[in-house]
Amino acid sequence: MEKFEGYSEKQKSRQQYFVYPLLFQEYIYAFAHDYGLNGSEPVEIFGCNNKKFSSLLVKRLIIRMYQQNFWINSVNHPNQDRLLDHSNYFYSEFYSQILSEGFAIVVEIPFSLGELSCPEEKEIPKFQNLQSIHSIFPFLEDKFLHLHYLSHLEIPYPIHLEILVQLLEYRIQDVPSLHLLRFFLNYYSNWNSLIISMKSIFLLKKENKRLFRFLYNSYVSEYEFFLLFLRKQSSCLRLTSSGTFLERIIFSRKMEHFGVMYPGFFRKTIWFFMDPLMHYVRYQGKAILASKGTLLLKKKWKSYLVNFSQYFFSFWTQPQRIRLNQLTNSCFDFLGYLSSVPINTLLVRNQMLENSFLIDTRMKKFDTTVPATPLIGSLSKAQFCTGSGHPISKPVWTDLSDWDILDRFGRICRNLFHYHSGSSKKRTLYRLKYILRLSCARTLARKHKSTVRTFMQRLGSVFLEEFFTEEEQVFSLMFTKTTHFSFHGSHSERIWYLDIIRINDLVNPLTLN
C-alpha cells in the first residue's frame, strides 16, 4: 500500500496544481471569455427547464455572496437564507443553478488550458472515429476471441458526497472553493448519512447536470487510476521473482524437476509464468475486465479491487458488484447490445485421393444482438405501446401537424436502426419498427377521428418512406437485383457507424420522462 501511495503522489506531482482564487473574484467573467478557450462566443450555462444563464450572472452572484452583509444576514437569519429559501422557490432554484453551473465552468478551465498547452506548430493528430462509442465493438470483436474470462464491474454508486470533495483536494488548493462545493452538496443530500439516497442523486443530476458530470467523471478517473496501478504492477511481475505466489513456487519446482528428467523438452517460456494482457472497457457506470488468465487469477483481481476500493475510497464494495464468468458460456449487456462469444461447430469434408473424412472445427464468433424486452419496455414507458408490445396511439402529439407526427415517429425509428446497426439479427428491430409505424398510424387516425386503414390508403408510399432507414438503403446497394433478399429476414450483416457519440435514449430507460 505504501508503494501505491508513492506511485499516486509521483503521478499527481507531474500535474499542475490548480489554484482557484478566481471563484470569488470578478476575473472569472474575463477568464471564462478568453478567446483561446471559447473563441468569441459567450459562455452560456444550461440549467433545468432549458433555461440559459450567462456567465455575467455568475459573476454578479459570486460578488454578491462575497460581500460580508450577505453572509452575516444568512448566519443571523438562517430561516431566511436568500439562496436556500424554500418559501421562494424561483430564487432558490435560480441562484443554486447559477452558482453550481458557474463552479463547474471554473473547474473545467484548467482542463481546457491543458489542451491548449501544446505548441501551435506541432500538429496534433485527431482520431474522430475513436470518439464514437461504436468503435468499442470492433475492438471487442478483435480481442475477445482470444480471451477466456470476463468480469462485469459496476462502479460503486451512489457514494458519500464527501468522498467527491476529498478527491478534488488533490488538484484544487483553494479552500474556499471546496467549502462552496460542500455547501451545494449539503443542500441536496443528508450530510449525516453514510450513503446518500437515490432521490438526492437524482435531484443533483437533474438540476445540476454540468456539475454532477464533472464530479462523477472525477470520481471515475480516480477509480480507474488505481486500476491502472494494479495493471502496471501485474505486468511487472514477469520481471521479478515469482515467489510471491505459492502456487507458482510449486509449479516452478515441478517444471525444474521435469526439465532435469527431460532436458531440452521445454524451450520456450510457458504462458503461465506471464500475467496475461488485461482489457478494460467502460461506459458510464458499467465496465468490463477481460483476460486470458486462469480462474484463480481472476478471483485474485476481484479481491484486489474490493480491498483497494475499501482502503482508497473508504467504503465497502459489495463483492456481487463484480461478476466473474467464463467468456464462452455467458453473455454480457453493454451499450444496449447483448454480446456473447459462442463456439460454433463446423463440419468440413476433406478429400485426400480416394479417402474422405470429416473434420470437426470449432470456431469462436463475437455475436451482438438487440434485447427485445428492455426496448419494448422503453417504448411502453414512452407511451408508444403496451407492456406486451401492442401498439397504441400517442395522444400528446395529436395537436401537431401530420408531417410533424410523421417526422417524429420516423426519426425515432431511424435512430433506433442507426444505433443498433451492429446487431447480427434484425428481427427485434423490425418488430420495433412495426410498433412505431402502427402507433404513428393510430395517432394520425385519432387526430382526424378516422380509421387506420383510411390513413394508410391516403398516404400510401409516403407513409412507408418515412420509416425507410439508412441501413436498408445501404443494403439495397450491396445486393443486386438478382439476389433474393428480404429486408425482413434475419441477415447477419453488421454495420458499425462511427458518428455515434452517446447511447440512445430508448436504450437507457432512466433518461425517459
Curated annotation (Swiss-Prot):
PANTHER family: MATURASE K (PTHR34811:SF1). Keywords: Chloroplast, mRNA processing, Plastid, RNA-binding, tRNA processing. One of its GO terms (molecular function) is RNA binding. It holds the Pfam family MatK_N. Its main location: plastid. HAMAP family: MatK. It comes from Molinia caerulea. One of its GO terms (biological process) is tRNA processing. It is found in: Plastid, Chloroplast. Belongs to the intron maturase 2 family. MatK subfamily. This is Maturase K. GO terms for cellular component: chloroplast. Usually encoded in the trnK tRNA gene intron. Probably assists in splicing its own and other chloroplast group II introns.
